[in-house]
Amino acid sequence: AGRGKQGGKVRAKAKTRSSRAGLQFPVGRVHRLLRKGNY
């Protein structure tokens, strides 16, 4: 219930962390797809 209120604050404070997580998230997803697709 309080996730939306905390999300804004956490997002503003974890700006650098968000950037790092965003980079690791897609990379992991792409890596998994690449491995499954045998590209």
UniProtKB/Swiss-Prot annotation:
The modification N6-succinyllysine is found at K9. The modification N6-acetyllysine is found at K5. It comes from the Eukaryota. Monoubiquitination of C-terminus gives a specific tag for epigenetic transcriptional repression. Following DNA double-strand breaks (DSBs), it is ubiquitinated through 'Lys-63' linkage of ubiquitin moieties. It is found in: Nucleus; Chromosome. The modification N6-(2-hydroxyisobutyryl)lysine is found at K5, K9, K36. Keywords: Acetylation, Antibiotic, Antimicrobial, Chromosome, DNA-binding, Fungicide, Hydroxylation, Isopeptide bond, Nucleosome core, Nucleus, Ubl conjugation. GO terms for cellular component: nucleosome; nucleus. The modification N6-lactoyllysine is found at K9. Residues 1-18 have a biased composition (Basic residues). One of its GO terms (molecular function) is protein heterodimerization activity. Its main location: nucleus. GO terms for biological process: defense response to bacterium; defense response to fungus; killing of cells of another organism. There is a cross-link at K13, K15 (Glycyl lysine isopeptide (Lys-Gly) (interchain with G-Cter in ubiquitin)). InterPro entries: Histone-fold (IPR009072), Histone_H2A_CS (IPR032458). Disulfide bonds: none annotated. Residues 1-24 are annotated as: Disordered. The nucleosome is a histone octamer containing two molecules each of H2A, H2B, H3 and H4 assembled in one H3-H4 heterotetramer and two H2A-H2B heterodimers. The octamer wraps approximately 147 bp of DNA. Core component of nucleosome. Nucleosomes wrap and compact DNA into chromatin, limiting DNA accessibility to the cellular machineries which require DNA as a template. Histones thereby play a central role in transcription regulation, DNA repair, DNA replication and chromosomal stability. DNA accessibility is regulated via a complex set of post-translational modifications of histones, also called histone code, and nucleosome remodeling. Buforins are strong antimicrobial activities in vitro against a broad-spectrum of microorganisms including fungi. Buforin II is more potent than buforin I. Belongs to the histone H2A family. This is Histone H2A.
